[in-house]
């Protein structure tokens, strides 16, 4: 019994061991099968494995532009402020009560237009008095002259002494002097009356009124009645570095007016175009700049006094210049360079000499020719002689459309 019992346990143990061995054998085969595709894929991707490993990687995508030949203007730029050609504070020349205002705030007026009236009563009275005194003295003079004529006849017969004749002559001369004084008084009174009507001294735009009708005003008031700014034409005062003076003077010697453009604060919109008026006669030693004044017609009222603008003055135009986008110009240890594409879309580095430059384009004086293709984007991935793929610039709209399409595709896959 004991022998048969031991035999059964031996059989059970052998079966368990066989089952465990079979399980490990089956698990090992599954692992080798799942590892085989990965190994194959690695072999395909390995540079030394299979035909696919012998193929080159994808070409670097770049954007390119063609160098063109064109006329390029040269501008000098500066910051400036619009100033009125003339600014006049309209004040009363006489004292009195303000009776009427004949303008609308902000309107354009012409020189001589009536702006305000002061009560003329006192000035009319003064004029009448002066005219009356003049008439009286004229009558006195006429009588004195008649007496003088009689004295001149009587002195011949010794009925009147020579002394009396001289006295009468002096009286006539004195009265003539009084007449001149009276005439001046009349003119002064008339002037005072005229000044009670206040007119515009210059063409321009009136500002806000400084006094209301009914107030007593005087010639000593500093605030005045209203301020007129002449805006047709209007001036731009800006500064240039002293190093640009020679360029401006040389351009002026050509005999043509230099064009000055006024751009808005963000330098994105041209407001108006005028001409150079003058340079200041001295340099500001503190800033090393010189003041420049330009004049604009401003019939469209695009410019306003005290407005901040960016000024651009055209001083020269470079003809037949080779121009490329500014993004293509790079700077290295050897100097400025660009990447040039040949007919096989292989790139090579060309050292260049840049000229006039702005945020959009740059003139190349030496190093490339018109018609050469230069890389403008994807430059950081380039090496000498590398072959690249030239792609078109992708607009923001296109990017948004593609992103939207991908989002719809994801939603469709989830649904």
Curated annotation (Swiss-Prot):
Domain of life of the source: Bacteria
Pfam families the UniProt entry points to: HlyD_D23
Signal peptide location: 1-21
Keyword list, A-Z: Cell inner membrane, Cell membrane, Membrane, Signal, Transport
GO MF annotation list: efflux transmembrane transporter activity
InterPro entries: CusB_D23, Multidrug-R_MdtA, RND_pump_MFP
Membrane topology: Peripheral membrane protein
Region (Disordered): 32-56, 392-415
Localization: Cell inner membrane
Basic and acidic residues: bias regions: 399-415
One Gene Ontology term, aspect cellular component: plasma membrane
Induction field: The mdtABC operon is transcriptionally activated by BaeR.
Function summary: The MdtABC tripartite complex confers resistance against novobiocin and deoxycholate.
Family per record: Belongs to the membrane fusion protein (MFP) (TC 8.A.1) family.
Subunit description: Part of a tripartite efflux system composed of MdtA, MdtB and MdtC.
Protein name, UniProt field: Multidrug resistance protein MdtA
Naturally occurring in which organism (per UniProt): Escherichia coli O7:K1 (strain IAI39 / ExPEC)
Gene name of this polypeptide: mdtA
